[in-house]
């Protein structure tokens, strides 16, 4: 239902002559409004990797509003507490500077080429390294990631 809602919202916003940036942001939030957000650093890093900091914070607000609007059991305080905890974890992850993008990895495309990778294999390996770092941020050091890549070269098509 999220994909259909996002597509419909995009059309409505276009008909209402909203600017492209606003349309993109709103459609993205609607498309992700069913994503599971937890007060867990790994979950938060994944959301930040998917959406970026601004959109992740907006998504928290959208989810709070959505859940409170559907709150049939009178759980408003629990909902607000949960999303305050999620916001705190976002603050902690951002303050620590945890890696949440390929660009922020301690290695890059040049390192992959030096190891013999080319084309799509570079992106695949960097994305796999990001997945590792989202789970274990302490792995985001040049030497650790290069060793990890060397150990996983056979899993990647050069």
List the predicted regions and their residue ranges:
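Divalent metal-dependent catalytic cores for phosphoryl transfer on phosphate-bearing substrates
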Residues: 1-84
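Charged substrate- and nucleic-acid-binding regions of tRNA-handling and nucleotidyl-transfer enzymes
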Residues: 9-17, 71-158
């Amino acid at each position: 239902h999220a994909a259909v809602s996002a597509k419909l919202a995009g059309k409505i916003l276009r008909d209402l002559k909203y600017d492209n940036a606003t349309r993109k942001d709103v459609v993205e939030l609607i498309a992700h409004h069913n994503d599971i957000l937890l007060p867990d650093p790994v979950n938060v890093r994944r959301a930040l990797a998917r959406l970026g900091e601004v959109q992740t914070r907006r998504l928290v607000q959208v989810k709070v509003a959505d859940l409170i609007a559907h709150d049939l059991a009178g759980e408003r305080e629990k909902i607000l507490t949960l999303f305050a905890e999620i916001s705190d974890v976002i603050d902690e992850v951002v303050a620590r500077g945890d890696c949440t993008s390929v660009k922020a990895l301690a290695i890059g495309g040049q390192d992959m080429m030096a190891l013999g990778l080319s084309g799509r294999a570079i992106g695949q390996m960097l994305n796999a390294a990001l997945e590792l770092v989202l789970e274990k941020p302490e792995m985001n050091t040049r030497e650790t990631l290069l060793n990890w890549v060397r150990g996983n070269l056979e899993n990647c098509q050069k």
